[in-house]
Amino acid sequence: MGFNDMGIRFHKKPFEFHKGWVLVHGDEGSMNTNAGLTALGLARKFGKSVVCGHTHRAGISAFTEGIGASYRTLWGLEAGNVMDKKKASYLKAGSANWQMSVAVIETHGDRVSPMLVPINKDGSFTLYGRLYA
């Protein structure tokens, strides 16, 4: 796919890119039809927050466990896609529950803030208050 040409390292196994956060392809567990819940299922399986692709859906979900001041929150983020759905000839009837978006992960020391950037049908999106069209 030309990853090397783009300076992208492909990891075949889950990759911890920040303490407590794992990047995975998304096919390591059970698929859920609700956006964000495949990633959250993987987060609960791995015991770390997860960012994944593969599902082509855009969603973020969280699960918190613990009691009182002793708790943790796991995040599951599915990054969506940037594909041309018209070229997905394998789709029956050309229909799929897929959303166009990209994920942005901001870190400040140990703090991590995941977010989704929805991409409009015309390919435009807004990030940090600026419209890209």
Please give the residue ranges for each predicted region.
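Active-site neighborhood of divalent metal-dependent phosphoester bond hydrolases
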Residues: M1-F10
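Gly/Pro-rich turn-and-neighbor structural signature
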Residues: K13-P14
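Catalytic cofactor-binding cores of redox enzymes
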Residues: F17
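Conserved beta-sheet core of the metallophosphoesterase superfamily
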Residues: G20-V117
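A short C-terminal boundary segment appended to hydrolase-like catalytic domains
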Residues: T107-A133
